[in-house]
């Protein structure tokens, strides 16, 4: 391992919840996923991760993992994002990641339209659009403390704390 990769691992030790052995193990998994050896995982490679392709929010998850908006997920982005979901991940970081799934335009708020889009992805054709819109409207109305018609992170966080969202954002598997 050269100086640059060693420095990356050292940075990841400081910035994540993983120890050196876990990072090395995840690096091997990352390299297996990186089928074209480009140093990053594209959408197709990301979808080959077990359980990801079946997740209706897979596209949004990839976009949130991709911090620099390059279209691919590099090793640092991969490890940093996975760290959030480890058992040692902080609740606030887990909720911020979930918030970013909904905040499609990255303006720091979840609008009525964004909430509708993400929930539509999740429920598919199981609900009529009118029913879904009623749920979205009620969700915004019940949680929009400042009355601006959208949810800030703090409003989202308060709403999520009353549900089992935090538990569902923790990986239960040994990495």
UniProtKB/Swiss-Prot annotation:
The keyword Repeat applies. GO terms for molecular function: calcium ion binding. SUPFAM superfamilies: EF-hand. Ca(2+) 1 binds at residues 34, 36, 38, 40, 45. It comes from the Eukaryota. Signal peptide: none annotated. Keywords: Calcium, Metal-binding, Repeat. The keyword Repeat applies. Ca(2+) 4 binds at residues 144, 146, 148, 150, 155. Ca(2+) 2 binds at residues 66, 68, 70, 72, 77. Ca(2+) 3 binds at residues 103, 105, 107, 109, 114. PANTHER family: PROTEIN PHOSPATASE 3 REGULATORY SUBUNIT B ALPHA ISOFORM TYPE 1 (PTHR45942). Composed of a catalytic subunit (A) and a regulatory subunit (B). This protein has four functional calcium-binding sites. Regulatory subunit of calcineurin, a calcium-dependent, calmodulin stimulated protein phosphatase. Confers calcium sensitivity. Belongs to the calcineurin regulatory subunit family. This is Calcineurin subunit B.
């Amino acid at each position: 391992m050269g100086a640059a990769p060693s420095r990356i691992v050292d940075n990841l030790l400081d910035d994540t919840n993983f120890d050196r052995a876990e990072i090395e193990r995840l690096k091997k998994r990352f390299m297996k996923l990186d089928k074209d050896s480009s140093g990053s995982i594209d959408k197709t490679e990301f979808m080959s991760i077990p359980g990801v392709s079946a997740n209706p929010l897979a596209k949004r998850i990839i976009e949130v993992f991709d911090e620099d908006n390059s279209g691919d997920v590099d090793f640092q982005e991969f490890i940093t994002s996975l760290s959030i979901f480890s058992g040692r991940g902080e609740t606030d970081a887990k909720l911020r990641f979930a918030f970013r799934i909904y905040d499609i335009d990255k303006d720091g708020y979840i609008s009525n339209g964004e909430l509708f889009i993400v929930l539509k992805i999740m429920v598919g054709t199981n609900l009529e659009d009118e029913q879904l819109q009623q749920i979205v409207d009620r969700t915004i109305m019940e949680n929009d403390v400042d009355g601006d018609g959208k949810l800030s992170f703090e409003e989202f966080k308060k709403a999520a704390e009353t549900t089992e969202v935090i538990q569902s954002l923790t990986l239960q598997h040994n990495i």
